[in-house]
Amino acid sequence: MNSILQNQKPVEFFSAERIKIEIDGQQILWRDMTLKIDSRIGEHTVGKIKYIASLQQINIYDAAIDKDEDIKIIISGRSNISNENGTSNDKIFLNGIIDDIKLSEIKTGSLVVEITCISKSIILDRIPRYRSFQDPSLTYSAIAEEINKNYGANGEKIISVGEDMKEVPRMTIQYNETDWEYLKRIASYTGQPLMASSNKVLVGFFKNMPAQTPNLAYSYFGKETEAERTYYRVEGTEVYSVSTPIKLKIRNRVSGEEVENDYYVIESRIYNEGNTLKCEYKLGKQTDYFVDPIPHEKIRGAVIEARTVHIARTDESKSEHGRAEGSSDNLEGRTIGAKPLNKYIEKFKNESQNENVKEKVKTKDIAVMTLDLTEGLMDLGENEQSFEDKYAGKSYFPYITPYSQSNTGFTPAPEVNDRVALYFPSGNETKAFVIGALNNDGNGRFTNPDKRNFTLGNSQSGANAGKPMYDFTLNSEVFSISVGSIIDMSSGGSVNISGTSKVNIDSSGTMDISGTSTVNLKSSGADTNIEGNSEVNMKVSSSKISIDSSSIGINASDEFTADADGITIGAGASTVDIKGGEVKIK
């Protein structure tokens, strides 16, 4: 291996005959074993063992088969290298759960045992759950803390987060995903993997773990490329698990320069050849983007019911609800992950620019709302599946408005606390939008085809700082209302009808103008005319009719009649003139 220089520490190996198997804490006696353990980033570690066991321990296997709970298994080996105290090191190859056991008795009085086991990470991959993490400022550690509460006792934490895993790049919703699927997906947004490591689940690599320097003197070493990434593959007797940091100093075949790089084990396969345990592992460079972003396929096309927390607009200078009450991160062009640009796309862009490239318009002033998904999530799952929305109201979601740009839609916004339908058109939950209101108590009235009305709720003068609950403004030349029978206008306060030019109130039949108090007919600028085609009648049921003016003229072309129990003309006047061609006083 002239191209690889190593610190020449002793070569570590493990004898297959010194492998130890424990099932639920009891050590197993075995012979003639065949062992294979496969692990890789983003997958559970799977082990397959076949050996001959003693019939004296058949009760251990019977108990394991009959047990309803998980059966724990630990597979470990003893190294040839001793520690500072002279004691040989033990290394755990798999700490997990038995998935399947097969027993076969043979004529020699022994048992053939076949066991398939899987890492403890599998317990995260059993129950699909529904959770909202809609706060875009959440960190991976905060999310892991929430999920850890479902597992372990006495505060034990099965999930650990790498030190480079800070804020999740965008808001996320766990929809019909196991915790394993969800963590694997959100870790992919930073290019980092989810890994099963011993009895832990690791979110991203840990750079503060001590790096190992393999001795490759008796190992096969090779280089390969896959999906635009370069890997190194090593096969030898030294065993390294997935996520282990590795240091390698490699000499460039062309320049002869020695360069030391940091790598991670991203695949590992442990197996035995006779009495020798071997390990084939694959190394990826620490600077690589290890995994591509995983879309949320399970939420594509889904609808979650939600409660409106508040209505807003994204232009904070115009909105009564500022951005402090919600985040518009999911509206401003966030991608599904931070994946580097595909080199073929980059090449195409350099060679031929499309003249019709669509302009990417940044969100400016659009109608949005914040939501509480608790009720909808609870409807989707059973106990231990669904969780309340702890981060309600932390993200803006746009909602459908009729003709929103010209603003000609009619009452497009749901009200606070209305149930609405949040729709997810793609595998990116940040692209969700509200398609309308549903399942609100009282909206059954809309099923009546003879009743098409708009009803306001209770007065909001107190809660709404005295502003009108419904403000209707018409900017047009003509506004006409025509119905077949009745138009009824009623107000608990005042009704004002005003026109800058002329106001006509016309009826082809009888028209009544009445009031329980005073009725005033007044013109401040000109005459007030009362005209009837047949008669004009004025009647007061209790007191009198007063006509008060500097001059009063009464003119009749035919006959003028004044009739009463008593008529007084000119009481208190100095002179009373009664004129006519013929005057009769009787």
Each language-model region and where it sits:
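Juxtamembrane "anchor/assembly" segments of surface/extracellular structural proteins
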Residues: M1-K72, S76, T116-I122, Y130, ...
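Amphipathic, non-transmembrane alpha-helical segments in extracytoplasmic/periplasmic proteins
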Residues: K48-K50, C117, R131-E156, Y175-A196, ...
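Surface-exposed cap/loop segments at beta↔alpha junctions
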Residues: I58-I159, M171-T172
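Short coil-to-beta transition motif at edge beta-strands of beta-rich domains
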Residues: A63-N83, E238-G256, V416-V420
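Short, Lys/Arg- and Gly-enriched loop/turn segments at beta-strand edges
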Residues: S79-L94, R253-I266, G427-A437
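Short, conserved beta-turn/loop elements at beta-strand boundaries and strand-helix junctions
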Residues: D100-K107, E267-G274, I311-S317, N439-N443
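Short beta-strand-centered interaction patches in the first periplasmic/extracellular domains
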Residues: V112-I115, S119-S121, G162-E224, E260-D262, ...
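Structural signature for extended repeat/solenoid scaffolds and their inter-repeat hinge/linker regions
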Residues: I246, E305-D563, I567-I569
